[in-house]
Amino acid sequence: MVANGHFASNGEGQDSGSYEHGVQVIDEDKEFNPNVSRYLTYENVTPAGFNYHLISVFGSQSTGKSTLLNHLFGTHFSVMSETERRQTTKGIWLSKNKRVESSKDRDPQMKMADNILVMDVEGTDGRERGEDQDFERKSALFALATSEVLIVNIWEHQVGLYQGANMGLLKTVFEVNLELFLKDNKSTPRSLLFFVIRDFVGTTPLQNLQNTLLQDLNRIWSSLSKPAGLENSTINDYFDFAFAGLPHKNFQPEKFVDEVQKLSTRFRNAHRDPNNVDSRGTGSIEGGIFLPEYHRRIPADGFAVYAEGVWDQIVNNKDLDLPTQQELLAQFRCDEISREALVAFDEAISPFESKQAEAVQAGSPQVLGGLGPVMRNARMNAVKNFDAEASRYHKRVYQMKKSELEEKIDTRLKALFLGQLNAAHRSGVQDFSESVSAAVKAGQKRGASYDFAEIVSRERQLAIEKFEKEARSTLVEDAPWSNYQQELSLYQKDLERISGQLRRDEMRRLATRVERWVRSRLGESVDLEFNALGSGRGGSGAPEFGDKPSENTIWDRVWTIFVDTVLDAERRFTERASSFDASLDEVDVGLWRLRRKSWGVLRAKIEEEVMEGNLLLKLRENFEDKFRYDDAGVPRIWRPTDDIESVYTQARESTLTLIPLLARFRLAETNAPPPLDKWIGHTPSSATPADEEDLTPIGGVDEDEGKSLEEEMTMIGEAKKQDLIVRFKKTADGVYVEAKRSAIGGITQVPLYFYGLLLALGWNEIMAVLRNPAYFFLLFVCAIGAYVTYQLNLWGPIIKMTEAASHQALEEGKRRLRDFLEASDTGRQAMAMSGARNATEEHEMSNLNRKSGERGGQKYRGEDVADDDDVDDDF
């Protein structure tokens, strides 16, 4: 026996050199070699898919099977030594076709098929195993389950014999074939039995030998016990047959080599010729011997796993179910391929998953740039790689595993997709809100009117386009979850919600501006009306044109001013609200709130006017105007002969009538409160609790308030009214006393003896004046001037003019003195020292005055001034 050290037997070290000539698939102890897949990888057969062919050789021990394979396929199987007659091939060995063909000696169409794998099966009828035929049966079953072509190696002189022609082995092959067919009832697997007749001398024609073998095979087939339904089946239903003869290797070596060369050309792909139909009704085989129907349809990368599973079933004496084995292989390989595909998928997707998870955990989801292309490429590559490897396996299993892979991939991609849309949703809503607010502020800064509805519509369209662009860029075509319509609908609803909120906020800001405008206008107008109460005369207190307004109709005028102002505000509010695309319900609620707020403004203003201090001041002014001035508005100069008591009583009683008049808001025309409840109207049905929470309850309007309209219109209570009457009377009494004192003051001011003393002491001067015509005339003129001045009541203006002239003269003197002092050095130094001292004192006094002013005026600067400055120019 020639032993070759470049075969990898079961259990040997697995270096690359050990696979040079082949691998032992099953050893003599019936153990399967787990390194078969490594050998196929070493020979680069694994990537071939279905583009490979498997041949097994059968025959009696020591009949030259290995020698035939070595010459035919260039393999290096161990062969028997010429000097010994014993078993050389133990178990089953596998090697790839190593035959080197010369292009100049071979037609390219006659080239051997690619990736031919040859299995050298242990010979039968050997003395080493004796009567133990278990391995023969198991190896035959294994070869038939895996191989396309079964080469039967026999000698010419054995044709016609039973044992010598391996008819016993062939009977075993036929039996296990039927066994396999029973399990695979969906198809009829076919194989090729290739009889190679050795030491063929040609005396008996090859056709006769072929006929003899076919007769023996048919006889064996007929003798088999067939399962139900297959009683009439023939051997040709499962097998095709081919025959070849080879000369004696030792006696005709050159011819043997030539015939082997010719025989090798038959090991190529074949097809059936439909124009040349055989006895079975199928086309004859043309070309080579490898028909597609012989192939077991096991991809090369799964052959090792499949073969191991088949052998495990065989060696454990279990029923061999090839379809089940193919499905198990498909499941195993598809799972492996799926895991490999997911590795590359993980490398591409995991970074984005981590970024998205971190952003969500931080509470600020962010849109991941470049996610869409990565998702599409990762999914496409994973499915493509899976299809390339797994599509060659069992179709049902392949489809099932592909669906599982796509489900795993799509589950993760869908999570990324939804996370991306969620981030785009949040950022889009935020950007939309900020953009609308920025556009509104820009319009307010420009001072021009802006269309809020147009701003919202434009920004909303931009936000939707941005969201759809991001969603489309993240879509994965053909994925079942690649539909963002639901998310888009939710996004649009959120934009609508935000738009509504922004519109309501803008409506509230508009209402606030209108309220400020109403407050400003009402404040001015009501101030004028109440200030008119401070003038009881028809002169300075009366309007510039027309008569003095009647005090009894003050509430009518206030109500008219109020209604006109609010109607104007409503018109402005409605015009501005139309640019917000506000609904009728929102406008109704806004107008209803405006009327209620405006009434609150008016009532607050009235309460301010009728405060005790303000009202007493106006009552005093009203009384003084009526008491100190006549009906023409001319000041009264009280004389002792005037009826001061009558004028005082009339003025006081007239002023006292204002207190009950101002105590209640009543219209003079109806002597009833104004129809405030009808004017404000009922609460709109669309009003929400939020619309009412900041409103002040109004008596007679709000039923839950428990206060009537009459009570709402009461501005001064009874106790306060009595107090005002008492205090006013005291004030009026003081004015009366002052007037009375001034009337009698001219008489009692100069004593009578003073005139006698003046006459006695000034007699000489009096006589000198009377005797001198010039002095007398001057005295006469002065007396006439004094009388006229007195009658015209011009002494006051003359005194004031005199004081002003003297003050101006004093200032002019100071200025001239200052100029004089500045002309000398001594004067300048004195002025500098005096100026520094005065500046220090003025600074201290200024600080005191400022602090006092800040405490007293802070409230008005924070309220009245701010309100006036904030009033929108549009209103």
Swiss-Prot record:
Its EC number is 3.6.5.-. It is found in: Endoplasmic reticulum membrane. InterPro entries: G_GB1_RHD3_dom (IPR030386), P-loop_NTPase (IPR027417), RHD3/Sey1 (IPR008803), Sey1/RHD3-like_3HB (IPR046758). The chain crosses the membrane at residues 750-770, 774-794. GTP binds at residues 59-66. Residues 676-704, 831-875 are annotated as: Disordered. Residues 690-704, 865-875 have a biased composition (Acidic residues). The keyword Cell cycle does not apply. Residues 49-307 form the GB1/RHD3-type G domain. GO terms for cellular component: endoplasmic reticulum membrane. Residues 1-749, 795-875 are cytoplasmic. It comes from the Eukaryota. Residues 482-506 form a coiled coil. CDD domains: GBP (cd01851). It is an enzyme of class 3 (hydrolase). Gene3D superfamilies: P-loop containing nucleotide triphosphate hydrolases. Cooperates with the reticulon proteins and tubule-shaping DP1 family proteins to generate and maintain the structure of the tubular endoplasmic reticulum network. Has GTPase activity, which is required for its function in ER organization. This is Protein SEY1. It comes from Blastomyces gilchristii (strain SLH14081) (Blastomyces dermatitidis). The gene is SEY1.
